[in-house]
Amino acid sequence: MRTLLIRYILWRNDGDPSYYNDDFEKLMLLDELVDDSDVCTLIKNMRMTLSDGPLLDRLNQPVNNVEDVKRMIAISAKVARDIGERPEIRWEESFTILFRMIETYFDDLMIDLYGEK
């Protein structure tokens, strides 16, 4: 699951078609959980610098169930899409934060999205 999410969010950032995976279809459905007009506000609330990827912990939004997890993934993907591709982005920090917030719900997420662990 970690590898899939990393590949998906990086793909959303650069849009390289050779990086596309059919498993991304289910993850793209999560986009409807976050309104495009909210992304600028979310980026502002994350107080990001030019070298930051999505910093979800700065939103102070709890993750208490699989729906919260799906929203965090959607926020990460949309922020990654909108910040643009730059070589200096510190993706490791962003992914560490994301996974720390959602790892408790990985199995539930897999079952919800794909019907199995």
From Swiss-Prot:
Induction: Expressed in the early phase of the viral replicative cycle. InterPro entries: Orthopox_N1, Poxvirus_Bcl-2-like, Poxvirus_sf. GO terms for biological process: symbiont-mediated perturbation of host apoptosis; symbiont-mediated perturbation of host defense response; symbiont-mediated suppression of host NF-kappaB cascade. It comes from the Viruses. Pfam families: Poxv_Bcl-2-like (PF06227). Keywords: Early protein, Host-virus interaction, Inhibition of host NF-kappa-B by virus, Modulation of host cell apoptosis by virus, Viral immunoevasion. Signal peptide: none annotated. Bcl-2-like protein which contributes to virulence by preventing host NF-kappa-B activation in response to pro-inflammatory stimuli such as TNF-alpha or IL1B. Belongs to the poxviridae OPG035 family. This is Protein OPG035. It comes from Variola virus (isolate Human/India/Ind3/1967).
